[in-house]
Amino acid sequence: LVVPLLAFLVNYIKTVQSKEVDAEGSLNLLNFSVILFSITTIFHMISSFENLLPILGITNFVNVITYGLIGSLVLATISLSYYLIPKLYGREVNYSRLEDITFFGFKISYLLLLINNTVLGVNSGYSWNAGANAGSPTIYGEGYGIVWSLISFNFSVNTFISLLLLGSGFLYLISVLRAISSGSITTVEEMVYSND
């Protein structure tokens, strides 16, 4: 995984450095999805050392990888749909404060989701591992109560992060519907390929 990730990142950085247009609107979200994918790939490489770090295979750390990969796919899809869906109706998105808030909401919620689940995975893994080494399993009984007191706050934070993600999705829906109904009209020349 290291060699493909390095090749991908080098090509991506060269492409970003050589672009002539500033990253505006949905292109900025697409760039963030690439960064999220890269971070998730690094987490995937770390989790492959399961024999060195046994806590990584049984905790929420595995969910970080899933959330990161799905998140990068969702953000890339949202970024492309901001261009494609209004174009199907002959419109385009006029980027405003609503789109900025939507993009910021998606970015911060996925970033917080990754950070919180990483902390949750490491905390629960070490406490479960410590309990097992001490001879008191933490899957049930008093040991479970101790572990739950360590990780319950993170699960509550996950709920609020999910609500932030839901709110960002609702703002995305409003933004796309607004672009379809009252966005700038795209001319036919922009939509049709010409041989000139």
Cite the ranges covered by each PLM segment:
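Hydrophobic cores of alpha-helical transmembrane segments in multi-pass integral membrane proteins
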Residues: 1-14, 28-51, 62-89, 97-147, ...
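Inter-helical turn/loop segments and adjacent helix faces that build the functional surface
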Residues: 15-21
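Membrane-interfacial, low-structure loops and terminal tails that flank and connect transmembrane helices
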Residues: 19, 189-195
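Non-cytosolic membrane-interface motifs at loop->transmembrane helix junctions
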Residues: 22-26, 56-65
